Swiss-Prot record:
Expression across tissues: Red blood cells.
Annotated organism of origin: Tachyglossus aculeatus aculeatus (Southeast Australian short-beaked echidna)
UniProt subunit comment: Heterotetramer of two alpha chains and two beta chains.
Protein name listed in UniProt: Hemoglobin subunit alpha-1
Described purpose of this protein according to its UniProt entry: Involved in oxygen transport from the lung to the various peripheral tissues.
Length: 141
């Protein structure tokens, strides 16, 4: 559970990022594919080249889902329920991949917002992204 101070940190930092949803989401996915090539197997139907319209579109969807999560700290389970169902029952994404993508988002945020990416903001974002990953994998059981 995020503390009020952590929620404030996430809201502040993600507020700056959410206006760049497509850019940051695509960058996080590109970093994921480069750093962890096995993750590409879930996207064999997409053009994964740098700057691909499909990667940008999916990156925006991912970032928009994080915006939804950031707006529903106290009811994240219900806010992300459909997305959790999709990933668990249809896409069957290996749960470890959510952690890998979360790390890539942390790198993107640190790169674009170095002044705001303080140790406390880093810790809060990491905790938030871990919570999102937990929610998305909650229906795997």
């Amino acid at each position: 559970v995020l503390t009020d101070a952590e929620k404030k940190e996430v809201t502040s930092l993600w507020g700056k990022a959410s206006g760049h949803a497509e850019e940051y989401g695509a960058e996080a996915l590109e970093r994921l594919f480069l750093s962890f090539p096995t993750t590409k197997t879930y996207f064999s139907h997409m053009d994964l080249s740098k700057g691909s319209a499909q990667v940008k579109a999916h990156g925006k969807r991912v970032a928009d889902a994080l915006t939804t999560a950031a707006g529903h700290f106290n009811d994240m389970d219900s806010a992300l329920s459909a997305l959790s169902d999709l990933h668990a029952h249809k896409l069957r994404v290996d749960p470890v991949n959510f952690k890998l993508l979360a790390h890539c988002f942390l790198v993107v945020l640190a790169r674009h917002h170095p002044a705001e990416f303080t140790p406390s903001a880093h810790a809060a974002m990491d905790k938030f992204l871990s919570r999102v990953a937990t929610v998305l994998t909650s229906k795997y059981r």
